[in-house]
């Protein structure tokens, strides 16, 4: 039977519940347990697909095409279990399901209320998510409850967790509470009062935490841990210090050294083998001892909030691990390029344009792409970054001066990039879209097979056909492909059913390393294995730096 660990947060948001949950999962997996994770989001949106990256950060896409919270990306990077739609759900989905049941008459005329109907539905979603784990029936399901204790939005989720713990019985569920212990510089000490109040708030709901994870900018002294233990009624050895680290991949070892996994296993009456965290130690060793160094410019419009590109940043870090190269990322606002030109790019070893939506900043990105192409600087374009690379090539090489995307200019006569109106989803079902379709849940989503053209750089990089994850509604227009290919551009991968361009590149006679992909390879990169495309990109950046005579 699956045991459950509920992870809650207190005092403030953004303390790192997702990293803490993923790190615990990694330790338990290293002990031979089958583990899955779920994220419960208390916002009313059905999913984060239409939410602003400035508010929500990155939208992580699962293999089966769900637009989910970025924490699911952390889950997949820390453990081997793949996430699915059922691993993330929101208040919006819960209420949508309950209202649909009420309309069908499932409640037989009863008054539908938060308790028991909403809380029962939350429990059903949790158990369904755990049961659908790709690892088979999990030994442990770690359930991260979004938001902060005390938020009105989180109350139904916390109540559902309390009820579920009671229903499952002793040693079947436990609670881990992540809280802030701030350092007050003027007083010169850590303050435990916010944590005391946070635990008190949790106890008012009827939840008694078994473990406290205390976030601080430094290790919490024993005296403060004793005080927290006394006031929160949590054993002293279960008051665990989680201080700031320069790499999230150090957190599993940090938590294991303080006995978190031992406490959880004892509480859940599990007796797995000892933990083997040698892989994490090796990763940290590689991170801290690189042999080379490169600087890559990421040109986008969400650069003030790097959470918008979380998986991409991590994929570059994974590539650094597997190439022994420290990757420094410079975030460059594409609108500043529109105003000030491309001088800010001239010291870079490579340029990357990530995915995105909307017209704002696109001409700055196109200017950056033109600079990379003409200056022979390695270039990687992802999703929108590929589309803009095709537009730049069409304008400046092929001579289609009005080339554009219908996303930015619906009336452009040279629709080099246009809306996909029909495609097959990963289950073989035909999907159709028009300009009038809803924004939410209407993109080409999830993992799709990409056959690669023999003799291309793409084949050198991947070595075989691949399955990559997608999130887009616009695509390179096949009507212009003959003109683009006549100019030298190579379409190096296409979808097997609809013949949609999936990868483009320039031949080495035109450029040493210039690649665009319609999919999002960052979603499948892990610290264990890296990703061949990002490894090749970092190697190209290193070669460019060395070719310029700069010490790498």
From Swiss-Prot:
GO terms for molecular function: ATP binding; CTP synthase activity; glutaminase activity; identical protein binding; metal ion binding. ATP binds at residues 14-19, 71. Allosterically activated by GTP, when glutamine is the substrate; GTP has no effect on the reaction when ammonia is the substrate. The allosteric effector GTP functions by stabilizing the protein conformation that binds the tetrahedral intermediate(s) formed during glutamine hydrolysis. Inhibited by the product CTP, via allosteric rather than competitive inhibition. InterPro entries: Class_I_gatase-like, CTP_synthase, CTP_synthase_N, GATASE, GATase1_CTP_Synthase, P-loop_NTPase. Keywords: ATP-binding, Glutamine amidotransferase, Ligase, Magnesium, Metal-binding, Nucleotide-binding, Pyrimidine biosynthesis. CTP binds at residues 13, 151-153, 191-196, 227. Residues 1-270 are annotated as: Amidoligase domain. The keyword RNA-binding does not apply. The active site is at 383 (nucleophile), 520, 522. Pathway: Pyrimidine metabolism; CTP biosynthesis via de novo pathway; CTP from UDP: step 2/2. Residues 295-547 form the Glutamine amidotransferase type-1 domain. Signal peptide: none annotated. L-glutamine binds at residues 356, 384-387, 407, 473. Its EC number is 6.3.4.2. Belongs to the CTP synthase family. Catalyzes the ATP-dependent amination of UTP to CTP with either L-glutamine or ammonia as the source of nitrogen. Regulates intracellular CTP levels through interactions with the four ribonucleotide triphosphates. CTPSs have evolved a hybrid strategy for distinguishing between UTP and CTP. The overlapping regions of the product feedback inhibitory and substrate sites recognize a common feature in both compounds, the triphosphate moiety. To differentiate isosteric substrate and product pyrimidine rings, an additional pocket far from the expected kinase/ligase catalytic site, specifically recognizes the cytosine and ribose portions of the product inhibitor. Homotetramer. This is CTP synthase. It comes from Burkholderia ambifaria (strain MC40-6). The lineage of its organism: Bacteria, Pseudomonadati, Pseudomonadota, Betaproteobacteria, Burkholderiales.
């Amino acid at each position: 039977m699956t045991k459950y660990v509920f992870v809650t947060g207190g005092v403030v948001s953004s303390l790192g519940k997702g990293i803490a949950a993923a790190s615990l999962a990694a330790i338990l997996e290293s002990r031979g347990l089958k583990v899955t994770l779920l994220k419960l989001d208390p916002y009313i949106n059905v999913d984060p697909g239409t939410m602003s990256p400035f508010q929500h950060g990155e939208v992580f896409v699962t293999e089966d095409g769900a637009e989910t919270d970025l924490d699911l990306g952390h889950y997949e990077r820390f453990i081997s279990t793949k996430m699915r739609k059922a691993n993330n759900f929101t208040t919006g989905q819960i209420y949508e399901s309950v209202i649909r049941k009420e309309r069908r008459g499932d409640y037989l005329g009863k008054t539908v209320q938060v308790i028991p109907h909403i809380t029962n539905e939350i429990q059903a979603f949790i158990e369904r998510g755990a049961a659908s784990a790709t690892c088979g029936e999990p030994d442990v399901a770690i359930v991260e409850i979004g938001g902060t204790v005390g938020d009105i939005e989180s109350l139904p989720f916390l109540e559902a967790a309390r009820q579920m713990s009671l229903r499952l019985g002793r040693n079947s569920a436990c609670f881990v509470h992540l809280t802030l212990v701030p350092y007050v510089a003027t007083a010169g000490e850590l303050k435990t009062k916010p944590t005391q109040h946070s635990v008190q708030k949790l106890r008012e709901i009827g939840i008694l935490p078994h473990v406290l994870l205390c976030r601080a900018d430094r290790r919490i002294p024993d005296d403060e841990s004793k005080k927290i233990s006394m006031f929160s009624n949590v054993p002293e050895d279960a008051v665990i210090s989680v201080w700031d680290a320069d790499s999230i991949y150090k957190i599993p070892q940090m938590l294991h050294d303080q006995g978190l996994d031992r406490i959880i296993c004892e509480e859940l009456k599990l007796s797995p083998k000892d933990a083997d965290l040698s892989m994490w130690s090796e990763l940290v060793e590689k991170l801290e001892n690189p042999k080379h160094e490169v600087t890559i410019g990421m040109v986008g419009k969400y650069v003030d909030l790097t959470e918008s590109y979380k998986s991409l940043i991590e994929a570059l870090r994974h590539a650094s691990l597997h190439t022994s190269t420290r990757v420094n990322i410079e975030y460059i606002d594409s609108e500043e390029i529109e105003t000030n030109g491309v001088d800010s790019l001239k010291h870079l070893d490579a340029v990357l344009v990530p995915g995105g939506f909307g017209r704002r900043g696109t001409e700055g990105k196109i200017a950056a792409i033109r600079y990379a192409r003409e200056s022979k600087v390695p270039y990687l374009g992802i999703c929108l970054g590929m589309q803009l690379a095709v537009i730049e090539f069409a304008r400046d090489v092929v001579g289609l001066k009005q080339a554009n995307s219908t996303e930015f200019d619906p009336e452009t006569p040279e629709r080099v990039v246009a809306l996909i109106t029909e495609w097959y989803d990963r289950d073989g079902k035909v999907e159709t879209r028009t300009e009038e379709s809803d924004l939410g849940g209407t993109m080409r989503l999830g993992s799709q097979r990409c056959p690669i053209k023999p003799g291309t750089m793409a084949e050198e990089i991947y070595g075989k056909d691949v399955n990559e994850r997608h999130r887009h509604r616009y695509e390179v227009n096949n009507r212009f492909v003959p003109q683009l290919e006549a100019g030298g551009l190579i379409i190096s991968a296409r979808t097997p059913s609809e013949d949609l361009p999936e990868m483009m590149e320039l031949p080495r006679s035109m450029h040493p390393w210039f690649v665009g992909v319609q999919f999002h390879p960052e979603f499948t990169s892990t610290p264990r294995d890296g990703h061949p495309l990002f490894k090749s990109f970092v190697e190209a950046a290193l070669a460019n730096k060395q070719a310029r005579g700069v010490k790498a």
